[in-house]
Amino acid sequence: MIPKVSKIIPWIKDNKKFLKKTYKGIERESLRIDIDGNISKKPHPIIFGSPLTHNWITTDFSESLLELITPVSNSKKYTINFLNDLHIFIIKNLINENLWPMSMPCKINNDSSIIIAQYGNSKLGRTKTIYRNGLKNRYGAKMQIISGVHYNFSFHKDFWKKYNNFYKIQDKFSSIGYFNLIRNYYRFGWIIPYFFGASPIAHSSFFKGLNTDLIFKKNKFGDIYLPFSTSLRLSEIGYINKVQKKIKLKFNNIEEYVDIVKKAMKTPYLNYKKIELKNNEKNLQINVNLLQKENELYSHVRPKRSLNKNKYKLEDLIYKGIEYIEIRSLDVNPFSPIGIKINQIYFLDIFLIWCILIESPKINDEELRSINENWNRVILYGRNPKIKLINFFKKKEKKLSEILKFILNDLQILVESLAFKKNNKIYQKIFFDLHKMTDNPNKTLSGKLLEESIEYGVERLGLDMSKSHKINIENKKLKVINYQSLIKEAEKSIKEQIVLEKNET
């Protein structure tokens, strides 16, 4: 039986102003491509500042893999407008380049075309590059340039006072509450790739040298896909790898989480020992352990704290508390010029509020297996109308469409209880669209993208979309940041990197 919010509707209505006060931030990744649709071989443009110290514009694995970061805000519109402004600045300053609009990469002629991100000569900068060398040697460079959108989310401290009082929780740092949310996200978060997964297909070059037991199909252009997949990015050919399945996170409490992750960071792994640490004075990885560092842990959601001058200890989660959670299961929305639409933010917020309010029992080994199986089914076969998920609490399986309708109906009850008067029409439209996607899986993002990719091919469709998005972005005006502020931030970041390097000599 899926928990419902109906049991605590009176409390929700009494505390709606605290529930509505949530904070968010977005991290959007996107590959720079040349005019022919190849991955860019140019270094990170200097006009964007230093990727090591810039607050909003950085790089992920590759020099060509941009990461755009919005500051924390309690406003959905501000967040989406800030992300939009960053894209305007990027697009206006790319020379003979564009942004690839999909999660799965553009065509990759060979791995040597993927240049690992560089961060200068400071100890911090060198460590970041060595870490990426390790990722390349462990998982392959192609997997590391799969793009995603990370959604950062938190509640105001006033909410936690009300929440802890209601549930009689003694918790100075709100870790118990955040882990209640995280467990329910693991139980039901597969709803995100069902509706918003957008990587059912990839260019054939991605699959060269890839070993998998999955049975794929090809379109007439040679692109490779799974007919009912929602998100190959989240599958075994993406970020869910067999090695990390050894790390069994249940998110039952903060101490257990930190202990498991620390153990993985200290446990040598035979295959990584074979890679070694150095070859001809080139650092191949930070260490030979299951995880080089916490960031290497590929999970659907993470408890997080903000970096303080690029310093962070895993134990800070215990002694200083969780500041926010990072949702990592969002594919890039290829139909949006900025990789995400505001209706997705509305849904994410209400879904995460629902996750904190419904019952959240501890996860045991048996339920963990069911949870992982449910995610796998939705990721690989989610648009199959016959697909069923495991209802762990009832010890039986139920059709995915029935579970989706149950959750959507409960979310609508929650929205009504929170009385979003200004946004009532927005939520009505969102739920109308989501119910349509439930009844007809082909209307999901993955369904629409697969249909167009089969007709036009990934390469042509991606190029056409990137050109269309560029035109859309170029003609917009900045709304929340002015152009000069972006230039100043870039200049400031370069100076900060220089100071960092000088202080180490």
Swiss-Prot record:
<dbReference type="InterPro" id="IPR014746">
    <property type="entry name" value="Gln_synth/guanido_kin_cat_dom"/>
</dbReference>
<protein>
    <recommendedName>
        <fullName>Glutamate--cysteine ligase</fullName>
        <ecNumber>6.3.2.2</ecNumber>
    </recommendedName>
</protein>
<dbReference type="GO" id="GO:0004357">
    <property type="term" value="F:glutamate-cysteine ligase activity"/>
</dbReference>
<dbReference type="GO" id="GO:0006750">
    <property type="term" value="P:glutathione biosynthetic process"/>
</dbReference>
<keyword id="KW-0547">Nucleotide-binding</keyword>
<dbReference type="InterPro" id="IPR007370">
    <property type="entry name" value="Glu_cys_ligase"/>
</dbReference>
<keyword id="KW-0067">ATP-binding</keyword>
<comment type="pathway">
    <text>Sulfur metabolism; glutathione biosynthesis; glutathione from L-cysteine and L-glutamate: step 1/2.</text>
</comment>
<comment type="similarity">
    <text>Belongs to the glutamate--cysteine ligase type 1 family. Type 1 subfamily.</text>
</comment>
<dbReference type="GO" id="GO:0005829">
    <property type="term" value="C:cytosol"/>
</dbReference>
<dbReference type="GO" id="GO:0046872">
    <property type="term" value="F:metal ion binding"/>
</dbReference>
<dbReference type="Pfam" id="PF04262">
    <property type="entry name" value="Glu_cys_ligase"/>
</dbReference>
<keyword id="KW-0436">Ligase</keyword>
<keyword id="KW-0317">Glutathione biosynthesis</keyword>
<dbReference type="GO" id="GO:0005524">
    <property type="term" value="F:ATP binding"/>
</dbReference>
<dbReference type="InterPro" id="IPR006334">
    <property type="entry name" value="Glut_cys_ligase"/>
</dbReference>
